[in-house]
């Protein structure tokens, strides 16, 4: 097969591993920077151009789209879908998962365990907002944050008020969530491929930190998850419509709660912690499922 990888950096671990795995299995691979693509929006012959040439003949495309380029990256991916190229994850599913509020609303509607969450822009009554999530301590997040950036733990009511007021000055949308103290600064990353959890790891925040993201200095280790945690991760992936994703869970006193569903999960941490060949499993999934126009939305977005 001829496989495209939408990635801005061919040297990143995840991109390199996907290239290696695909080539080892006899496929032709090309890395494409989504921001350098330009498109011909045509009803009878949609095209993607790149560095002066028309990109065609691809059987599948693997989107590795960073959060900062979600809008343009998904537009490029959607164009490939319209051309009949099989996407590992569909553009509409990526857009859905990148919208933190929409994700939480969809998951809550289907009864998936979540932390108690408030959503606000410029709340008139901060006290009432804090009371709706059970009061301090709370975690306050910028809606557009990623990799633990724009996430603050407010231990007291006054600290929470100060953080919310500061975020108000940014004219930003915020999420205010209950702090799951019993998680002790750890979360679970469940790596889902094709409706199955193929690997899982525990991420532990460094001392004095509550964010367990590896980008924030957290450490990763192998973990055995419970059947309930496994089922929760699979359901979350299905609700988001993602074939491949990382589902982040916290162990709370009332069962597993979903913190995030990541449509472009890093491979390095999970492969290192579990010693599993995740990249090859992703390529194997593509081999099994890649057919022209094989998307739920039929490339309609």
From Swiss-Prot:
Any Pfam family matching the protein: Rimk_N
Residue ranges of every copy of the ATP-grasp domain listed in the record: 104-287
Binding site for Mg(2+) 2: 260, 262
Enzyme class: ligase
One function term, GO molecular function aspect: ATP binding
Named cofactor requirement(s): Mg(2+); Mn(2+)
GO biological process: protein modification process; SOS response; translation
EC numbers, comma separated: 6.3.2.-
Cystines in this chain: none
Positions bound to ATP: 141, 178-179, 187, 211-213
Cofactor: how and how many bound: Binds 2 magnesium or manganese ions per subunit.
Binding site residues for Mg(2+) 1: 248, 260
Keyword ATP-binding: yes
Binding-site residues for Mn(2+) 1, renumbered to this chain: 248, 260
Taxonomy, superkingdom: Bacteria
Protein family: Belongs to the RimK family.
Protein name as it appears in the record: Probable alpha-L-glutamate ligase
Lineage: Bacteria, Pseudomonadati, Pseudomonadota, Gammaproteobacteria, Thiotrichales
Gene name for this UniProt entry: rimK
């Amino acid at each position: 097969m001829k496989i495209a990888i939408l990635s801005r950096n061919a040297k990143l671990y995840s991109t390199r591993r996907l290239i290696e795995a695909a080539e080892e299995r006899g496929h032709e691979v090309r890395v494409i920077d989504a921001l350098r693509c330009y498109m011909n929006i045509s009803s009878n012959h949609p095209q993607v151009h790149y560095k002066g040439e028309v990109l065609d003949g691809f059987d599948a495309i693997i989107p590795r789209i960073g959060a900062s380029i979600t809008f343009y990256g998904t537009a490029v991916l959607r164009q490939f879908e319209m051309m009949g190229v099989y996407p590992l994850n569909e553009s509409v599913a990526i857009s859905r998962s990148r919208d933190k509020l929409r994700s939480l609303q969809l998951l809550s509607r289907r009864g998936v365990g979540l932390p108690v969450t408030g959503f606000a822009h410029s709340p008139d009554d901060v006290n009432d907002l804090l009371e709706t999530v059970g009061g301090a301590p709370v975690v306050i997040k910028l809606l557009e944050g990623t990799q633990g950036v724009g996430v603050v733990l407010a231990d007291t009511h006054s600290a929470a008020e100060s953080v919310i007021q500061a975020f108000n000055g940014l004219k930003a949308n915020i999420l205010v969530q209950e702090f799951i103290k019993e998680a002790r600064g750890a979360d679970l990353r469940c790596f889902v491929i094709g409706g199955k959890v193929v690997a899982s790891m525990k991420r532990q925040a460094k001392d004095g930190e509550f964010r367990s993201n590896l980008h924030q200095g957290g450490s990763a280790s192998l973990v055995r998850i419970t059947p309930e945690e496994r089922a929760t991760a699979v359901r979350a992936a299905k609700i988001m419509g993602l074939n491949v994703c990382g589902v982040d869970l916290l162990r709370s006193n009332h069962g597993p709660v979903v913190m995030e569903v990541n449509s472009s999960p890093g491979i390095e941490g999970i492969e290192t912690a579990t010693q599993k060949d995740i990249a090859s499993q992703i390529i194997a999934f593509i081999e099994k499922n890649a057919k022209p126009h094989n998307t739920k939305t039929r490339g309609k977005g």
